[in-house]
Amino acid sequence: MILTVTLNPAIDVSYPLNELKCDTVNRVVDVTKTPGGKGLNVSRVLNDFGETVKATGCIGGESGDFIINHLPDSILSRFYKISGDTRTCIAILHEGNQTEILEKGPLLSVDEIDGFTHHFKYLLNDVDVVTLSGSLPAGMPDDYYQKLIKIANLNGKKTVLDCSGNALEAVLKGDSKPTVIKPNLEELSQLLGKEMTKDFEALKEVLQDELFEGIEWIIVSLGADGVFAKHKDTFYNVDIPKIKIVSAVGSGDSTVAGIASGLANDEDDRALLTKANVLGMLNAQEKTTGHVNMANYDKLYQSIKIKEV
């Protein structure tokens, strides 16, 4: 079983408009509301793929109830209730553009943070892999993911971390390391303080930096150009075919789902990397975020090319 953690989930609201007019009324006819957050996207893709998954995180208020009520029944909801209201994130789609208005989310108390920590320990009993995705809610310290990873490691669970900024830096500088991290080139550049490109030799050099010591898998997203990955002392380039992209939103989360599934099933390097990339591409072919059409899985699977570099 795979446990997905979304500490700062949201209701994602989409407002499609022909034209966005400022300082006046804009009326929306076709409103879409879905449970949002990177970890929930991971949950839905794992569910589509047929994995057993349970989802946790911190939710509160009517917005939190909405998230529980609108997840597929086959996803085991194990959320921790807090006093604050779960945030709403609005995307206004207009004239080929997307304008986003993102709430910060609730402020968690010390007692609520401690409560979730105990809740997390309890949820580990029957899982093999834990995914940790997205931003931390207000009130949580930057090193909170480090704390969860330490607990998971002590319980013999594999962890996949997909975050950025201070939260990622705190983990890399900490004593407990995740099994997998999945930065993109921009996030890698931010970590290292220098611009990184798709130069494989340069990537090989930086991924051996002591900053990443102790992390079994480092999977660097290259967008439409695939992936550059390091597993222990072996490096891989994953070449993916060109596809028609409907929406790339959530494709990174779908890739995380594939990584988690590969770890849970003890797959070899090539199988894990292939599955992860196929699920990312399948999501990009869909309008709905965090959804994959498995009818196209086998064809894309055969088109992935992996070589050691």
Curated annotation (Swiss-Prot):
PROSITE patterns: PFKB_KINASES_1
Matches recorded under SUPFAM superfamilies: Ribokinase-like (SSF53613)
UniProtKB keywords: ATP-binding, Kinase, Lactose metabolism, Nucleotide-binding, Transferase
EC number: 2.7.1.144
GO MF terms held by the record: ATP binding; phosphofructokinase activity; tagatose-6-phosphate kinase activity
Catalytic activity: D-tagatofuranose 6-phosphate + ATP = D-tagatofuranose 1,6-bisphosphate + ADP + H(+)
CDD domains for the chain: FruK_PfkB_like (cd01164)
Biological process per Gene Ontology, one example term: lactose catabolic process via tagatose-6-phosphate
GO cellular-component term (any): cytosol
Keyword Signal: no
Pathway assigned to this chain's UniProt record: Carbohydrate metabolism; D-tagatose 6-phosphate degradation; D-glyceraldehyde 3-phosphate and glycerone phosphate from D-tagatose 6-phosphate: step 1/2
Keyword match Calcium: no
Family to which this protein belongs: Belongs to the carbohydrate kinase PfkB family. LacC subfamily.
Protein name: Tagatose-6-phosphate kinase
Protein encoded by which gene: lacC
